[in-house]
Regions:
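Generic hydrophobic alpha-helical segments
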Residues: 24-25, 80, 193, 259
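Hydrophobic alpha-helical transmembrane segments of membrane transport/permease proteins
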Residues: 47-86, 239-250
Length: 326
């Protein structure tokens, strides 16, 4: 190796890195799947935030339209996605439905995240009997299917917007708790934690200043994936008749169950909210997968190969081949 090559190698070694989060952000923006997910989520958030400006009236405003030989007018210039069996504009209800889906998803994930962080931190760092007690309770909650658990909670509390938030939030608690506990256990015996203990740093300071910042990455990824799951759970509860009962609260799952009798004569009434659910869930899943690849050291560098070798990356086709058959 020549002197010039040695000097260039030394300069490359001495060049400072941008830090974990900055490097992860650069990897994330180079991931086309994550970019597509961010675009879909941006559409979802835009529809939710600016629904009053983009909608054609209110969500329960009825338009009396006479249709010969049919029940519901199809898409038209005045009503882009048609109207339902009660004369309500479907486009308007989809926009307002995005608002309520986003609200329920954010609140429910926040409930599960906050409680799960507390329980997971205590279980992972304290250990012993406290760890066993908390984890056995989490195991009992995880033994019940999530949607069935949410149905039981809503049946106990009664149908409604706030009840759904609580139900979906409780379902997410054991997921975040177990995830953070495992991440803390992996970080607890690292050298920097042992060094902090050796110099007499207090245990709460070690937990909040040294362990949690390094253990939070999987929780962030799970938070985006939990948003997708929350949207599905909310739609499922609404489809079963446990969603908001107020007609002014259009929820996508409730919109699906309201048009069961019109699937043959007006199929767009079910297709439109179904597509809205698919797009929003796909967006959050793609962002979550992109964050996982950006933050997980074991997956770094795979995004580029996956993009080059798989033309159907957004559907997950060709992943195993793109990763060398692993």
């Amino acid at each position: 190796m020549s002197v010039a090559e040695l000097e260039a190698h030394e300069v490359a070694l001495e060049a400072p890195t941008g830090g974990l989060w900055r490097d992860a952000f650069h990897r994330l923006v180079r991931n086309p799947a994550a970019i597509l997910g961010a675009f879909l989520v941006s559409l979802f958030i835009t529809a939710a935030v600016f629904a009053p400006l983009l909608a054609h009236g209110g969500p329960k405003t009825q338009h009396l339209i006479l249709v010969a030989g049919g029940c519901c007018p199809g898409p038209s210039h005045a009503h882009w996605l048609g109207v339902d069996q009660l004369g309500r504009d479907v486009y308007t209800r989809i926009l307002y439905g995005a608002r309520f889906s986003l609200l329920i998803g954010v609140v429910s994930v926040s409930i599960g995240l906050s409680v799960g962080l507390v329980l997971g931190s205590i279980a992972g760092y304290v250990g012993g009997f406290v760890d066993s007690l908390i984890m056995r309770c989490m195991d009992v909650m995880l033994a019940i299917p999530g949607l069935l658990f949410a149905i039981g909670i809503v049946a106990l509390l009664g149908p409604g917007l706030y009840q759904i938030m609580v139900a979906v939030g409780v379902v997410n608690i054991p997921i975040f708790a177990r995830l953070l506990r495992g991440s803390i256990l992996a970080q607890r015996e690292n050298d920097f934690v042992l060094a902090a203990r050796a110099v007499g740093v207090r245990r709460p300071v070690i937990l909040f200043s040294h362990i949690l910042p390094n253990a939070i990455s999987p929780v962030i990824v799970q938070g985006t994936l939990a948003m997708a799951t929350a949207i599905i759970d909310v739609a499922g509860l609404g489809f079963l008749g446990l969603g908001p009962q107020d007609p002014a609260t259009p929820e996508w799952g409730t919109m699906l169950t309201d048009v069961n009798d019109y699937l043959q004569t007006a199929p767009w009434l079910a297709i439109v909210p179904g597509v809205a659910i698919v797009i929003s869930v796909l967006g959050f899943n793609l962002i979550g997968d992109g964050l996982r690849e950006a933050l997980d050291p074991k997956l770094r560098g795979r995004t580029g190969r996956f993009r080059e070798r798989s033309p159907f990356w957004f559907l997950g086709v060709g992943r195993r081949r793109a990763l060398g058959g692993v």
